[in-house]
Amino acid sequence: MINDERMVAFINSFDKGNTSFLNQIEKEARADAVPIIRTETQTLLRFLMAAHRPMEILEVGTAVGFSALLMQEYAPAGAHMTTIEKYEKRIPIARENFKRAGKE
């Protein structure tokens, strides 16, 4: 968690916002009390993806797939992502979100 207000303001200055699709997933997740990364973490993640352009990504803790889909938007073409989730009730929701995004 990022606590320093100046750091948060700096990170948020780079925020471009999300696609309407990601905004919808985030809204649904919050309505269902599913943890989603904070706005400044989303911004930092987008920056890191653009700066490092990883070809292999491992995400631990998929939840509903929000972070994975965010990273896939900023990953270079041909990048491969593996994401895992242990809470079985969320796995079908994540799969459905990947399907809705065309990332199945």
What kind of region is each of these model predictions?
Residues M1-E104:
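A short alpha-helical cap/connector motif
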